[in-house]
């Protein structure tokens, strides 16, 4: 079972529907107490960085999410859910993120239409399990006004460009993030979600053999 975190800042049902369509059971989690029952989680999100972190704190999600990330189970952030994985966001002032990945979330430079909305290509920087079966320069759907700035090359799996190059798929170990919306990016976005579902199932199988 894949859990989708409900903190009032995401299009939860479209992600849930996409996973079920692919054959991967999913449920929306309304309380941190439900985390232990799922084998992988997705943190969606739309809106502002500060509002998202405030909502996560208000609903008691921050420490449980950090603990879950450290458990080694698959963790995927989507759009704003990817951005809050990082250390600091600069939207409406400077705000602390979850700190699971190194980097800052900054605004696109002046001169570009904001938000960056629509289809854009993903240039694959390195192989990773989420990109298996997806061609280089495949199109994905984006909606965002801020982007991640990180000097840690090891976490950059895919890049896009909107006046400046920006990370579109990031991660290391079990914590990953997609700046685009895979649930709106058929067919390749659904392939990425399928790859995540396979990873969750494989990880759960390995864990059960260890126990």
From Swiss-Prot:
It holds the Pfam family GATase. The gene is hisH. Keywords: Amino-acid biosynthesis, Cytoplasm, Glutamine amidotransferase, Histidine biosynthesis, Hydrolase, Lyase. Its EC number is 4.3.2.10, 3.5.1.2. Its main location: cytoplasm. GO terms for molecular function: glutaminase activity; imidazoleglycerol-phosphate synthase activity; lyase activity. Pathway: Amino-acid biosynthesis; L-histidine biosynthesis; L-histidine from 5-phospho-alpha-D-ribose 1-diphosphate: step 5/9. GO terms for cellular component: cytoplasm. The active site is at residues 79, 181, 183. GO terms for biological process: L-histidine biosynthetic process. IGPS catalyzes the conversion of PRFAR and glutamine to IGP, AICAR and glutamate. The HisH subunit catalyzes the hydrolysis of glutamine to glutamate and ammonia as part of the synthesis of IGP and AICAR. The resulting ammonia molecule is channeled to the active site of HisF. Heterodimer of HisH and HisF. This is Imidazole glycerol phosphate synthase subunit HisH. It is found in: Cytoplasm. Residues 1-206 form the Glutamine amidotransferase type-1 domain. It catalyses: 5-[(5-phospho-1-deoxy-D-ribulos-1-ylimino)methylamino]-1-(5-phospho-beta-D-ribosyl)imidazole-4-carboxamide + L-glutamine = D-erythro-1-(imidazol-4-yl)glycerol 3-phosphate + 5-amino-1-(5-phospho-beta-D-ribosyl)imidazole-4-carboxamide + L-glutamate + H(+); L-glutamine + H2O = L-glutamate + NH4(+). The lineage of its organism: Bacteria, Bacillati, Bacillota, Clostridia, Eubacteriales.
